[in-house]
């Protein structure tokens, strides 16, 4: 990509973000690095009619700001709905989570709900979870935490 917009609530992550751009031969000064609650940024982007070809969602399973507590199990549908609104038709949303509180089936239900509530259409391009050599013990289902879904917005 020529330009990215990174939104993170944690100011402490700025040096690491800059380092990652440098490692990937991307000019840091040409990237938008925003320290903000992502829900506030999404509202701003909608107001400014900003649209993105690719939106990557990788929130922590649980996070707290001054005004909001984010829980993946409770708030991921809302996060997806906000992302859908700023993704161009034909664009891709990469939805990921490390939350062990719900299954991949539930995660895909979150996606379905978000698109349905906005009367939008989508297709799942790919999905990933832990590799086969990373065994999850049947008595410790929480070990099956990784879920990544590539979603194409159709309209």
Which residue stretches match the model-derived regions?
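Conserved SAM-binding motif I beta-strand of class I
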Residues: 3-8
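A general structural motif
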Residues: 9-13, 37, 72-80
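S-adenosyl-L-methionine
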Residues: 12-56
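Flexible loop/turn segments at secondary-structure boundaries
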Residues: 13-14, 41-42, 61-65, 101-104, ...
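A structural alpha-helix within SAM-dependent methyltransferase catalytic domains
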Residues: 46, 77-84, 112
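Mobile active-site "lid"/loop adjacent to the S-adenosyl-L-methionine
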Residues: 52-82
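C-terminal catalytic and target-recognition region of SAM-dependent MTase-like enzymes
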Residues: 78, 92, 97-155
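Helix-to-beta-strand junctions that scaffold the AdoMet/dcAdoMet cofactor pocket
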Residues: 87-89
């Amino acid at each position: 990509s020529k330009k990215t917009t990174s939104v993170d609530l944690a100011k402490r992550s700025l040096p690491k973000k800059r380092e990652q751009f440098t490692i990937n031969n991307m000019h840091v000064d040409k990237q938008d690095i925003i320290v903000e609650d992502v829900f506030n940024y999404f509202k701003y982007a909608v107001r400014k009619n900003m649209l993105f070809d690719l939106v990557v969602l990788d929130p922590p399973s649980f996070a707290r700001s001054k005004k909001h507590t984010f829980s993946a199990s409770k708030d991921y549908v809302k996060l997806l709905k906000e992302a859908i609104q700023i993704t161009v038709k034909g664009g891709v949303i990469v939805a990921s989570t490390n939350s062990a509180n719900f299954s991949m089936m539930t995660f895909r239900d979150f996606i379905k709900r978000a698109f349905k509530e906005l009367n939008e259409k989508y297709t799942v391009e790919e999905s990933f979870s832990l590799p086969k050599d990373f065994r999850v013990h049947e008595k410790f289902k929480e070990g099956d935490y990784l879920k990544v879904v590539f979603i194409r917005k159709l309209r």
